[in-house]
Structures are given as C-alpha cells and as structure tokens.
C-alpha cells in the first residue's frame, strides 16, 4: 500500500476559495461539505485563536487589548502563509478560507494558482444580515457589530463579481437555515468539481516531472494519470 502524498494525493491542483462574512457559518459548512476530499484548509483564524489563548488574550477582541493583539495576528498570518506555501509546493488540494470582502486580492490569488496549474473554484456561504449578527454574538471569538455590518455589505457587493470570475466553478450556499438536504446537495456539487479531471494543462508538466522522479513514464493526459494513480492508492 502506497501512502498518498504529493503527486499521488487526492484532488491535487484543485483550489476552493471560501467566502462569507463573520457569522455566515463558513466553518460549519466547510466541515459538512468537504470531508473526505483530502483538501488542506488554509485559515489564519485557527492559528490566531490558538495564539490568543496562549497569550492569555480574550477571544472577544476588546479594544483594550488591541496593542497586544496585533503582533499575535501578524504571527498567525505568517504561520498560515508558510503552511499554504508548503501545500502549494506539493500542488495539494486547497480550501482557502476568507471573508470575500477583497475581490481584487482573491482574483489575484486565483490567477497565481492558475499559472501553477490549479483549477480554481469558490464556495460562497451567504446569510441575511440579521442571521450574521445573531451568530456573531454567539461566537466564542466575536467581532464588533459594526464590523459585521460593514463586512456583510462589502461581501454582498462582490457576489456578482465572483460569479463572473469563477463562472461554472462558483457555488453559493444559502446558510440562513441550511437543512441536511441542502448540505448534501452542496457536498455532491463540490465532490463533482473536485473529482473532475484537471482542466489546466499546466498541471501535466508538473505531474510528468514528479512521476519521472519516481521512475514512472507519463506521456500526458489526466485519464492516464488517474488510471495509474488509482492503482497506487
């Protein structure tokens, strides 16, 4: 039995951007809809919350701790950036968690990944403003209400832009009160996109190089690679 990693890892060259403001329930949705796909989650919030606890700082983000909190936030970003770099070096499948408030930044990141051979997608988790405010208030790490309002409005303005950019690779999830049947449908759609053969032809060169390092000949074409990789799993 061969360990699946690098070129043999499931869903290499697939990147899913996750968008949705504070209180949208992104973390819940991604847990319920991407399990078992072998994707690596890139989320600075995880490192940030751990470092806040280690520094004995409140998850409620009070203004009185802003000065102590900022270096912790920067350290969390550095840790996350290093992890993402390692994942990308192995062309591993990615779930890149963010709010979606900065369209230009996400579009730039997506184009950079595409130059490396990735197929890019977006999962947009949407809620009403009232639901977002209610959920934010119940979170262990909440943010000020005005930040939720401003973020929600900005993210809403970007829905059309993201839809045009990602086109058929854009999935929107209504998470005001997502029932099991909705999450099951979203899981199927994500799994279908993740399992599709890689459309970006730049991936072939990288796959061929990695297989050659292992003494395997690869003439190109995802069907050949998937057939071979399936035997090694």
Annotate the PLM regions:
Residues 28-92, 104:
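Conserved substrate/cofactor phosphate-moiety recognition/catalytic segment
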Residues 21-22:
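The conserved Walker
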Residues 114-135:
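Conserved phosphate-donor/acceptor-positioning beta-strand/loop module used by diverse small-molecule
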Residues 25:
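Conserved glycine(s) of the Walker
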Residues 130-233:
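Conserved GTP-binding G-domain of TRAFAC-class P-loop NTPases and closely related GTPase folds
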Residues 6-13, 86-88:
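Phosphate-binding P-loop
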Residues 15-17:
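Short hydrophobic/aromatic beta-strand immediately N-terminal to the Walker A/P-loop
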């Amino acid at each position: 039995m061969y360990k699946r990693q690098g070129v043999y890892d499931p869903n290499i060259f697939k990147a899913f951007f996750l968008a949705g403001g504070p209180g949208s329930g992104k973390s819940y949705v991604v847990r319920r809809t991407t399990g078992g796909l072998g994707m690596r989650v890139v989320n600075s919030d995880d490192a940030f919350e751990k470092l806040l606890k280690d520094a004995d700082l409140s998850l409620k983000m009070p203004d009185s701790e802003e000065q102590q909190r900022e270096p912790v936030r920067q350290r969390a970003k550095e840790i996350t950036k290093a992890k993402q770099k390692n994942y990308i070096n192995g062309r591993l499948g990615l779930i890149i968690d963010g709010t979606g408030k900065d369209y230009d930044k996400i579009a730039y990141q997506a184009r950079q990944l595409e130059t490396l051979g990735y197929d890019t997608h977006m999962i947009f988790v949407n809620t009403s403003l009232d639901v977002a405010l209610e959920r934010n208030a119940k979170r262990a790490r909440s943010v000020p209400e005005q930040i939720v309002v401003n973020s929600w409005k900005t993210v809403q303005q970007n829905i059309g832009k993201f839809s045009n950019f990602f086109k058929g690779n854009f999935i929107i999830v209504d998470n005001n009160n997502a029932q099991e049947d909705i999450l099951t449908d979203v899981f199927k759609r994500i799994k279908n996109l993740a399992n599709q053969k890689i459309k970006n032809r730049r991936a072939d060169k990288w796959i061929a190089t990695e297989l050659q390092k292992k003494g395997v000949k690869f003439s190109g074409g995802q069907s050949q690679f998937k057939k071979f990789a399936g035997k090694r799993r």
